Amino acid sequence: RDLRMSRGLGDVYKRQVFTYQGDGDLASIGTAEIVHAAHRGEKISTIFVNNAIYGMTGGQMAPTTLVGQKTTTSPYGRDEDWCGAPLKVSEMLAEVPCSYYIERVAVNNTPNIVKAKKAISKAFHYQMEGKGFTMVEVLSACPTNWGLSPIKAMEWLEENMIPYYPLGVKKDKGAE
């Protein structure tokens, strides 16, 4: 839904637009919008915050929740046989011919935060040049719904999320 609204605003006001979406929105109810925006090569930048849980609605399992990760709706952990594998949105969108730039970063330590800032800047730069659809996936902690202290949440992200969701550029047509 964010992407449809963004396209409308961009078209009407002739401005660059971006969306800031969580995994519950983008990887669940908004999957159709993100896939088709990438397929159309929309000149929109998306900042996709992946904390592997529905953080704003009570800590339910999201499409990005890791196998074995406990949530309010999966108290014994996500079961891959029952719920499928966690969705790797960046890898999926990198395969779309009209996507221009896709990168996954994390904000769990200072060096990664610096890399995240550079990736977001690059996405916006490509958008301002009219290159097409860009997305930066940001792996982020959710200490409250993970039931962890902020420090433990950063460690959990490093030990569990980054191995499943490897950091790095997934597609960069500007570098080809």
Language-model region placement:
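Single conserved hydrophobic/aromatic residue that forms the stacking wall/gate
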Residues: 1-13
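Alpha-helix C-terminal capping segments
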Residues: 10-14, 35-43, 95
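A short, small-residue-rich loop immediately preceding and capping a beta-strand
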Residues: 14-29, 44-49
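Short gly/pro/ser/thr-enriched loop/turn and capping motifs at secondary-structure boundaries
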Residues: 26-27, 51-56, 143
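Active-site-proximal loop->helix
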Residues: 31-36, 56-70
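Conserved thiamine diphosphate
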Residues: 62-129
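Flexible, low-complexity linker and terminal segments
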Residues: 128-176
